[in-house]
Swiss-Prot record:
The gene is MT-CYB. The cytochrome bc1 complex contains 11 subunits: 3 respiratory subunits (MT-CYB, CYC1 and UQCRFS1), 2 core proteins (UQCRC1 and UQCRC2) and 6 low-molecular weight proteins (UQCRH/QCR6, UQCRB/QCR7, UQCRQ/QCR8, UQCR10/QCR9, UQCR11/QCR10 and a cleavage product of UQCRFS1). This cytochrome bc1 complex then forms a dimer. Keywords: Electron transport, Heme, Iron, Membrane, Metal-binding, Mitochondrion, Mitochondrion inner membrane, Respiratory chain, Transmembrane, Transmembrane helix, Transport, Ubiquinone. This is Cytochrome b. Its main location: mitochondrion. Belongs to the cytochrome b family. It comes from Akodon lutescens puer.
């Protein structure tokens, strides 16, 4: 078996990626989230496949087909709630994974980092088009509001929006194409995830100390396969508790009402995962400015390798930047809270302050703290 594993053309790739892979001996549980994201993707594709067997992407039947899945299909309610809450778990793991990458300086592996940003954006796009499919009130108005943002693009904006809609409003054509996108994008994500791993294994994993670990590597199996398995069981436990006891806690009550173009909800709020970006968008009075800020709030991650001037790898021995990092996490939580609040005083002002702080931390404060710490080392 050992000879086959090392010599067979297909098994050799798996062996070098998951069995005999040299891994730093000191990576902590924060490194578990990569495998958890892989697990989330598998759960989403499998549950999504079964949902697609019973769902119809037509404005007249979409809402009732989701009700039919929950009422008449064997364990349809469970498949649907695993899919809906699995998406939330996916984003929680994604945010922790990115947060860990920033904290431990994984952005210096620039190819892996940039493909990670593409994965992040693709996942957000997939979640958005998926949120439209149940064709409830929030699905319809969320689709209308978010796609309308493209009309802020000069010259081609309005034409682009109508092209995406497939008409003059969000309608049957929009729903059908969103279903097509939602079906294909997870497979594109899976392909990018493999490229992400390919580039990671070119350089080897980072580790909490930020030091070179070439002299202290251990095989991935059995040490980290066991560790990942524990993480996966814990993830499944949380997911099952969510799906079985609190299935609708992360959803929106408006989505229990079928889509009605004549009746607008009190305030359209996106899914919990993208609220921080939505809060940044709303903080800027100008439409085009808001859209640019929304895009930059994600693309700012691509600036981390460029703005990094520190002589040290990661924040483990950098107390000044650690304080700024945790302030940024708190800032992100404030933005997430603001995104779900109505557009009125004091929420608008808090949102504007938090948005300015968000960009200031990443573009000004972290590079300044890098310089301060480099000078402290010289002393």
């Amino acid at each position: 078996m050992k000879i086959l594993r090392k010599n067979h053309p297909l098994l050799k790739i798996i062996n070098h990626s998951f069995i005999d892979l040299p891994t730093p001996s000191n990576i902590s549980s924060w490194w578990n989230f990569g495998s958890l994201l892989g697990m989330c993707l598998v759960i989403q594709i499998l549950t999504g496949l079964f949902l697609a067997m019973h769902y119809t992407s037509d404005t007249t039947t979409a809402f009732s087909s989701v009700a039919h899945i929950c009422r008449d299909v064997n364990y349809g309610w469970l498949i649907r709630y695993l899919h809906a809450n699995g998406a939330s778990m996916f984003f929680i793991c994604l945010f922790i994974h990115v947060g860990r990458g920033i904290y431990y300086g994984s952005y210096v592996l620039s190819e892996t980092w940039n493909i990670g940003i593409i994965l992040f954006l693709t996942t957000m796009a997939t979640a958005f088009v998926g949120y439209v499919l149940p064709w409830g009130q929030m699905s319809f108005w969320g689709a209308t509001v978010i796609t309308n943002l493209l009309s802020a693009i000069p010259y081609i904006g309005s034409t682009l929006v109508e092209w995406i809609w497939g008409g003059f409003s969000v309608d049957k054509a929009t729903l059908t194409r969103f279903f097509a996108f939602h079906f294909i994008l997870p497979f594109i994500i899976a392909a990018f995830a493999l490229v992400h791993l390919l580039f990671l294994h070119e350089t080897g994993s980072n580790n909490p100390s930020g030091l070179n670990s070439d002299s202290d590597k251990i095989p991935f199996h059995p040490y980290y396969t066991t560790k990942d398995l524990l993480g996966i069981f814990l993830l499944l436990l949380v997911l099952m508790i969510l799906a079985l006891f609190f299935p609708d806690i992360l959803g929106d009550p408006d989505n229990f009402t079928p889509a009605n173009p004549l009746n607008t909800p009190a305030h359209x709020x996106p899914x919990x995962x993208x609220l921080f970006a939505y809060a940044i968008l709303r903080s800027i009075p100008n439409k085009l400015g808001g859209v640019l800020a929304l895009i930059l709030s994600i693309l700012i991650l691509a600036a981390f390798p460029l703005l990094n001037t520190s002589k040290q790898h990661g924040l483990i021995f950098r107390p000044v930047t650690q304080v700024i990092y945790w302030x940024x996490i708190a800032n992100l939580l404030v933005l997430t809270w603001i995104g779900g609040q109505p557009v009125e005083y004091p929420f608008t002002m808090i949102g504007q302050i938090a948005s300015i702080t968000y960009f200031a931390i990443x573009i000004i404060l972290i590079p300044v703290s890098n310089t301060i710490e480099n000078n402290i080392i010289k002393l």
